[in-house]
């Protein structure tokens, strides 16, 4: 290498060194912040905080948790099929409907009668609606096929005039049917039954065959919503799930109807415990057991009420059907003369949510709990007045789940 080439190589090396030094100076002046300025901000999380809602903040693997039917096919001693009929109506809202169907199936099966598909009594007007206005009639027929003889309507020659009306307790027993219903049925050939719901009732008095029939009717998918209502309910659930995923938390359904609380809330029970909770009380409870303000909450109240403002203040992502439905769907399902449409949608949403919280303990809570238990959605939280500073959501799980004292556990295992 001659002297000229050496000088050129040295000059190039010097230039490269200058660029490196300049780069380091720029980096130091503009990008190397003091350590305290770039330290990641962290929030101390206690073991208690982690124990509150972490187990329900992610989608549970519901297929893994779902129970399996453990009833055997009904083996009632074959009852001679008679020429008589059992008629009934669905009343008081969807939370009662499947239990009413199950009672009617058990009665018809035991008496050897033909079951006539029911109408639906409008809770507002008392007028009759067709079963197909809310439910999939063909599905009902398919599910009951083989369990009991069913007809859509009474034959023209059969009159319902002077039909005896007999009240039967929900989860009616074989003994009750034999003593109270059978003599009337044999004399008249037709009975209209009306289910009533005792405050305490079990199916322990029934034989295994009647229990199996009851289980299969209640939890075998007998009552499914008609397609249009089902699709709307699914659409709402999908929206709420999407919003909850964006918030990285659970989607909580709260059964809270302002009018219902005013009409049904009886203050405290015999032991001095609250029987119902207002919106602000639900909000405070959820905060204390660890739910963050980004939690997505669905409330069964149809239209927004000022009574819910405090709940939304604590949980801004609180919605009602009115906030979610399109104007067309609102006109059809909310502004109609029948509350049955919206209550059917509420029942579905509360059965499918990540977490269910009842503001009042009653049939809606009991039957939603049953649907959730059999599908493995055990996150049912019951509010409480007294919440300790170290309380967690798991401490307030429904006794239906913790004590396994729901009918569903007699039917599934």
From Swiss-Prot:
Primary localization class, coarse: Golgi
Tissue: Highly and specifically expressed in the endosperm.
Stretches in topological domain Cytoplasmic: 1-5
EC number: 2.4.1.-
Pfam families linked: O-FucT
Molecular-function GO terms, alphabetical: glycosyltransferase activity
Residue positions with a glycan: 207
Membrane topology, record value: Single-pass type II membrane protein
Record's keyword terms, sorted: Carbohydrate metabolism, Cell wall biogenesis/degradation, Fucose metabolism, Glycoprotein, Glycosyltransferase, Golgi apparatus, Membrane, Signal-anchor, Transferase, Transmembrane, Transmembrane helix
Binding residues annotated for substrate, in chain numbering: 255-257
Domain of life, source organism: Eukaryota
Secretion signal, residue range per the UniProt entry: none
Listed GO CC annotations: Golgi apparatus; Golgi membrane
TM helices/strands, residue ranges: 6-26
Lumenal face of the membrane: 27-413
Subcellular location: Golgi apparatus membrane
Associated pathway: Glycan biosynthesis
Record flagged with keyword Membrane: yes
Gene Ontology biological-process annotations: cell wall organization; fucose metabolic process
Gene3D superfamilies on file: 3.40.50.11350
InterPro entries the UniProt entry points to: FucosylTrfase_pln (IPR024709), GDP-Fuc_O-FucTrfase (IPR019378)
Homology family: Belongs to the glycosyltransferase GT106 family.
Function field: Glycosyltransferase involved in mannan biosynthesis.
PANTHER family per UniProt: O-FUCOSYLTRANSFERASE FAMILY PROTEIN
Protein name (Swiss-Prot/TrEMBL): Protein MANNAN SYNTHESIS-RELATED
Taxonomic lineage from the root: Eukaryota, Viridiplantae, Streptophyta, Embryophyta, Tracheophyta
């Amino acid at each position: 290498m001659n002297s000229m080439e050496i000088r050129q190589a040295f000059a190039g090396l010097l230039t490269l060194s200058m660029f490196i030094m300049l780069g380091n100076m720029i980096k130091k002046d503009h990008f190397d912040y003091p350590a305290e300025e770039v330290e990641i901000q962290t929030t101390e999380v206690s073991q208690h905080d982690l124990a509150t809602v972490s187990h329900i903040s992610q989608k549970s693997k519901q297929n893994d948790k779902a129970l399996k039917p453990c009833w055997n096919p009904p083996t009632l001693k074959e009852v001679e099929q008679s020429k008589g009929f059992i008629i009934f109506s669905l009343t008081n809202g969807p939370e009662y409907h499947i239990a009413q169907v199950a009672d009617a199936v058990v009665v018809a099966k035991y008496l050897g009668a033909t079951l006539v598909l029911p109408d639906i009594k409008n809770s507002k007007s008392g007028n009759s609606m067709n079963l197909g206005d809310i439910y999939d009639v063909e599905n009902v027929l398919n599910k009951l096929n083989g369990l009991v003889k069913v007809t859509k309507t009474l034959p023209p020659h059969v009159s319902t005039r002077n039909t005896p009306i007999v009240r039967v307790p929900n989860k009616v027993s074989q003994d009750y049917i034999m003593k109270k219903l059978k003599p009337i049925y044999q004399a008249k050939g037709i009975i209209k039954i009306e289910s009533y719901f005792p405050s305490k009732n079990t199916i322990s008095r029934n034989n295994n065959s009647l229990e199996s029939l009851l289980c299969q009717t209640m939890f075998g998918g007998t009552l499914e919503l008609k397609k249009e209502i089902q699709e709307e309910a699914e659409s709402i659930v999908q929206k709420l799930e999407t919003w909850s995923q964006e918030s990285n938390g659970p989607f909580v359904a709260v059964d809270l109807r302002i009018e219902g609380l005013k009409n049904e809330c009886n203050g405290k029970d015999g032991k001095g415990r609250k029987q119902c909770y207002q919106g602000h009380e639900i909000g405070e409870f959820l905060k204390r057991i660890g739910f963050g303000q980004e939690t997505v909450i669905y409330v069964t109240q149809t239209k927004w009420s000022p009574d819910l403002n405090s709940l939304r203040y604590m949980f801004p992502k609180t919605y009602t059907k009115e906030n979610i439905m399109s104007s067309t769907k609102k006109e059809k399902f909310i502004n109609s003369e029948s509350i049955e449409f919206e209550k059917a949608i509420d029942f579905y949403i509360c059965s499918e949510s990540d977490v269910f919280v009842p503001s009042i303990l009653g049939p809606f809570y009991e039957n939603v709990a049953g649907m959730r238990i059999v599908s493995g959605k055990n996150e049912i939280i019951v509010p409480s007045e007294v919440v300790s500073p170290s309380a967690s959501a798991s401490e307030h799980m429904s006794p239906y789940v913790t004590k396994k004292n729901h009918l569903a556990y007699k039917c599934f295992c």
